[in-house]
């Protein structure tokens, strides 16, 4: 079994040491020191808000599936109509609304490559009206999506475990656990799924995607003929997301200044 990478990755590694003393020698001081480092590199900028009302993030679970005998059935948790009623009763200005588990059979099912909603939640027209209402109140509406993850459920449709899943240097599948167990897609499979979905949501819904993981998660792929190291993954993700930067929201750190 190969456990040592024969060809080293090509990149310049730089290590910065910062020594903290006195009141700054704690985790808060570390955060401030790193903040100052990003400011000095022109990577971090102060955002001025013209609206005094800070938006509140609200995440709704559409639903999920459960096994019944030999098939799955969808269990709705929050339909589009219910979500609209909740938002109306809260009457919060500038809400940041994220809808999780919107796809057919819900959160534990692979998202499609086009905008297809679970019928038990409502229609695309219903969702468009809701998104327009959120936007009119000064907020943003997004569908939750983790583009890197292939949900690992036996018999799951939508991808090939033989060709679409990234491999470690030991030829084992690269695994993850984020809300549910899964694998990581190869870059080709990620592109093939992400790009048409973005285009379809933009044309049909005019809303956004709340992207999980890809803003901070890097992994190498040693699949023969498709090798990709983490340094190369940064550039690939930057190029992939560049065309939809205003349309997508990253849950965590911006990958723009990360390095492997």
Predicted regions and their residues:
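Aromatic- and carboxylate-enriched substrate-binding clefts and catalytic-loop regions
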Residues: 94-260
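Conserved structural scaffold segments of CAZyme catalytic domains across common CAZy folds
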Residues: 1-139
């Amino acid at each position: 079994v190969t456990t040592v990478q024969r060809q080293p990755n090509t990149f310049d590694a730089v290590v910065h040491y910062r020594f903290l003393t006195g009141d700054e020698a704690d985790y808060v001081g570390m955060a401030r020191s790193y903040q100052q480092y990003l400011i000095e590199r022109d990577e971090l900028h102060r955002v001025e808000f013209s609206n005094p009302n800070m938006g509140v993030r609200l995440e709704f679970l559409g639903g999920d599936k459960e096994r019944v005998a030999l098939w799955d059935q969808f269990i709705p948790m929050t339909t589009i109509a219910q979500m609209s009623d909740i938002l109306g009763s809260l009457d919060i200005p500038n809400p940041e609304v994220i809808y999780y588990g919107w796809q057919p059979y819900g959160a534990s099912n692979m998202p499609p490559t086009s905008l297809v909603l679970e019928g038990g939640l409502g229609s695309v027209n219903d969702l468009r009206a809701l998104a327009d209402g959120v936007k009119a109140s000064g907020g943003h509406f997004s569908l939750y999506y983790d583009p890197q993850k292939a949900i690992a459920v036996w018999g799951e449709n939508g991808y090939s475990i033989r060709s679409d899943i990234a491999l470690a240097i030991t030829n084992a599948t690269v695994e993850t656990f984020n809300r549910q167990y899964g694998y990581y897609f190869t870059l080709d499979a990620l592109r093939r799924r992400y790009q048409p979905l973005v285009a379809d949501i933009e044309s049909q819904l005019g809303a956004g995607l709340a992207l999980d993981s890809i803003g901070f998660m890097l992994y190498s792929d040693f699949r023969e003929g498709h090798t990709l190291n983490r340094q190369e993954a940064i550039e690939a993700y930057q190029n992939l997301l560049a065309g939809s930067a205003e349309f997508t929201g990253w849950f965590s750190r911006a990958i723009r200044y990360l390095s492997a």
